[in-house]
Amino acid sequence: MFCLCLSLLGLLLCWPAATRNLLELKVECPHTIGLGQGIVIGSAELPPVPLAKVESLKLESSCNFDLHTSTAAQQAFTKWSWEKKADTAENAKAASTTFQSSSKEVQLRGLCVIPTLVLETASRTRKTVTCFDLSCNQTVCQPTVYLMAPIQTCVTTKSCLLGLGDQRIQVVYEKTYCVSGQLIEGNCFNPLHTIAISQPTHTYDIMTLAVHCFFISKKGGTDDTLKIEKQFETLVEKTGCTENALKGYYACILGTSSEVVYVPAMDDYRSSEILSRMTTAPHGEDHDIDPNAISSLRIVGQLTGKAPSTESSDTVQGIAFAGTPLYTSTSILVRKEDPIYLWSPGIIPEGNHSQCDKKTLPLTWTGFITLPGEIEKTTQCTVFCTLSGPGADCEAYSDTGIFNISSPTCLVNRVQRFRGAEQQVKFVCQRVDLDITVYCNGVKKVILTKTLVIGQCIYTFTSIFSLMPGVAHSLAVELCVPGLHGWATISLLITFCFGWLAIPLLSMIIIRFLLIFTYLCSKYSTDSKFKLIIEKVKQEYQKTMGSMVCEVCQQGCETAKELESHKKSCPHGQCPYCLNPTEATESALQAHFKVCKLTTRFQENLKKSLSTYEPKRGLYRTLSMFRYKSKCYVGLVWCILLTMELIVWAASAETINLEPGWTDTAHGSGIIPLKTDLELDFSLPSSATYTYRRELQNPANEQEKIPFHFQMERQVIHAEIQHLGHWMDGTFNLKTAFHCYGSCIKYAYPWQTAKCFLEKDFEFETGWGCNPPDCPGVGTGCTACGVYLDKLRSVGKVYKILSLKYTRKVCIQLGTEQTCKTIDSNDCLVTTSVKVCMIGTISKFQPGDTLLFLGPLEEGGMIFKQWCTTTCQFGDPGDIMSTPLGMKCPEHAGSFRKKCSFATLPSCQYDGNTVSGYQRMIATKDSFQSFNITEPHITTNSLEWVDPDSSLKDHVNLIVNRDLSFQDLAENPCQVDLSVSSIDGAWGSGVGFNLVCSVSLTECASFLTSIKACDSAMCYGSSTANLVRGQNTVHVVGKGGHSGSKFMCCHDKKCSATGLVAAAPHLDRVTGYNQIDTNKVFDDGAPQCGVHCWFKKSGEWLLGILSGNWMVVAVLIALFIFSLLLFSLCCPRRQNYKKNK
């Protein structure tokens, strides 16, 4: 019966992957590989293997890197297992003397028995180490395959295969977006264990990393510090033990890649920390694999045995069990200097360093360590797109890596490339009718697809007229403009080149239609009038003479003659229309009328008696004799059309943007007579800047004007914070440990070394219903129920907002007086003449809120209104926290229940929550408020950022006192001279341009003003600059203009002497711009572009064409002359005109 119990427990090892034989071993690599000596590590859990097949297991490789052959060699192990004593009766009750252990020597290959200097020289010799470890019970073993490779293999290898038994392991090298760090909490973390000594705490971060350690035996030598067990005994303050002679050390790798850390090494903080954790958890801090989170084991009891089997006395001891294996079953004895390797399926060997004898050390140890370090700084992405088929091919790249990329309009497929430190991600956008929006590294990028379509139009037009590519390209640049402006350009060119042919042709078609329309209207009018007369006659007859219906056939008559004919013919059975005989009944007569062909005889006679309507011949003659072929008429219409089309062209080139942003205006700025106080009251989005510029005029003297410039920068949020620590996620484990004799304190259980655990013991069974049949009965034994959290990992940083402040920098230039101040809500900038106040802010943040960041700060975070800080329960937000003061574990509010069945092993049930707070949050992520940030700056106690989404708003009030000293302030000695340095970008409303201006300020020390980018007609962009005496460089970003625009740097109505022409808007690839950079509100009161401005713009465009590609002008003039010749041939002068002449 006991064997049946063991078999049932073995079924708990059913693995989800047992039905497939291809598993994945992932190796995470930074995407920039330097000349360091680091090692990358990856591991994979394999399905269980029957115990009988373990000795034949061999780790094979098809990878292209060099492998160390040392681990593939056969290694002698002592197999130490347990069994029921042979002299035990079949129905005997289990006791401490019921079972015994046995030992034998076996040869195993591929286990993690790593010789000296293998890992130490792996990076230098470019050799990789592969091995596997075993966790076994009495029936099966759980293999774990490890791969440790020089970090340079990240460059040479992408994928390969390993084989162990029937299983195939796909080794996948995956490059992260980290330049050189490890990916933890979505951040790229570089552990620097010495930084805590030399730097203040707010300059570095602390993260929790996994640690994989492998024991390396080193026999010989005189260095007693390598007697590792002595180091453990010192830590637990154990004395009086006979010296354990084993020499060796652990070689540890931190996280996914690091240099090798040697344990023990007292001069290394990391080594000391790992040694301390090994002392606390001698078998490891990773207790279970994921599929075995809820499982049971039965403790058989404590056994001793011999290793090697030839020993005369017992040299090893441990706890025998049946059920799910927990820790490694491979270890090494510490008593002798010669290494003795132990394989103990179904036995947890003694690892308590407080004991003196029969101790072992595991060959592999997995745990966690908290280390200080730096988080790599991220850079913004550059995104560009090219037109491809019906959609667009886009690519995003960043100098330091892309940690987050998404798009609501594109399919981001994560196909990525690395070029040095730069990471590139390619994706496809299926639609180009809308602008492409991409969120990359926390920044919103917008790619204007209108420019892509322009480029495709230019390419198509140039391809069609490929015989003259230069001319075709120049014409395409002018024609391929979207909207009314483009159609106006097309109509202008058609009118100029072919107007003398199109005008008479269209006139002829219009005249023909008018003639047809006139005739149809006349014909319709005649018939309708006749019918109207008939109806009126009928109505009058009915009023005077009575009914117009025949009494015999009941037919309605329209005239008196028709009624008289009915009265004479119908009573005699004769048709009144054709006079043919028929029956004198209503039905017969009505049937005859349907086939009679003369029923309209009386109407026709009446119509003939009326005079026929003749249309007036003058209308036809005027339309027919119109001289649409006259050169005078054609030339007049041609000139009028050109003029009107030029006006439409100029007017359509002006794009009025109703949303906050730049509006194209003419030169100069607005003038306000200061009759009363000037007051502005407005609401400004948090990410927007505001510029207001006017000239304040003295109402009493119009010659006295004071330049006034008001500048408000975007909002900065200042939060005083408290760092609560790192939120952790973990696997919930529920374990049942049962033994049928002794008290519950007789044995130690696995969860008792876990960070967070809860245990309840059901001691001494009082009934037969909860005992397996081989147990001794009631009054003894123990069922220990435990829950613990395993595989803890950091998922995010948590900050609590203690106080909030919203600030904006405000600058005022009034004449020569300049004042700047950073104001916050309910604060003001006050001068003798001006008062600026932030009255309030509409915000979604409140003091007491908790901010959670699941990655870099630039990725944004989540707002929690309720965050647990004390007495947290498992499943609450903030349930598991790693703080500077240590781990904070949650309370488990549930209760245990022991499930019993007669003659079976009892099991534990837990009725509380089994889902961590982090996993609950991910399942309901959309229910939490989120926010984005840009330009973050964080210290120990403060966090500052800018809201890029304009989700917050400030209420601003500005008052300028009318009692200004115009006599003093109107005299402005500041002299501004401008010149153009360079220009980048394209004209038009697509990608825009960047104009670099050189601005010289003289006669005063500083001056706050705005510099515009304008052509001769209007302005397209502005930049506020605080000029200082001497030369200043100002960058002005604008959008608009046309092919003839020469963009100049302008201040008020003064512009640079020369201008520069921007490129055509058809770049091969269009680069996205930052949405936040365009969120500006500019108001200088300059007049809108009027009729004079339109003609000026049109003239500049025509001059631009004339001064550009002269071949284009020549082709247009040639087409014009050709159309004149065709006009002369098709529309010659009239012959009679020639004779009269």
Curated annotation (Swiss-Prot):
Lumenal side: 20-489, 654-1109
Glycan-modified residues: 137, 352, 404, 932
Transmembrane segments: 490-510, 633-653, 1110-1130
One Pfam family here: Hanta_Gc_C
Signal peptide stretch: 1-19
Positions of CCHC-type zinc fingers: 550-570, 575-596
Motif, YxxL: chain positions: 620-623
PROSITE patterns for this protein: ITAM_2 (PS51056)
Keywords: Activation of host autophagy by virus, Disulfide bond, Fusion of virus membrane with host endosomal membrane, Fusion of virus membrane with host membrane, Glycoprotein, Host endoplasmic reticulum, Host Golgi apparatus, Host membrane, Host mitochondrion, Host-virus interaction, Inhibition of host innate immune response by virus, Inhibition of host MAVS by virus, Inhibition of host RLR pathway by virus, Inhibition of host TRAFs by virus, Membrane, Metal-binding, Phosphoprotein, Repeat, Signal, Transmembrane, Transmembrane helix, Viral attachment to host cell, Viral envelope protein, Viral immunoevasion, Viral penetration into host cytoplasm, Virion, Virus endocytosis by host, Virus entry into host cell, Zinc, Zinc-finger
Spans within the Cytoplasmic topological domain: 511-632, 1131-1141
Modified residue annotations for Phosphotyrosine: 620, 633
Region feature Binding to the ribonucleoprotein, mapped onto this chain: 521-538, 593-610, 597-608, 616-630, 1126-1141
GO MF terms held by the record: zinc ion binding
GO cellular component, one term: membrane
Region listing for Inhibition of interferon induction, in residue ranges: 612-653
All residue ranges annotated as the ITAM domain in the record: 616-639
Gene Ontology BP term (one): virion attachment to host cell
Disulfide-linked positions: 29-154, 63-160, 112-131, 136-141, 178-188, 213-252, 381-440, 385-394, 410-429, 457-480, 740-775, 744-782, 756-889, 770-900, 785-908, 811-820, 828-837, 868-872, 974-1004, 997-1049, 1014-1019, 1050-1055, 1089-1093
Residues under site feature: Cleavage: 653-654
Region (Fusion loop): 762-782
Miscellaneous notes: TULV has the ability to regulate IFN induction although it is not pathogenic.
Similarity field: Belongs to the hantavirus envelope glycoprotein family.
Protein name: Envelopment polyprotein
Organism listed in the record: Tula orthohantavirus
Originating gene: GP
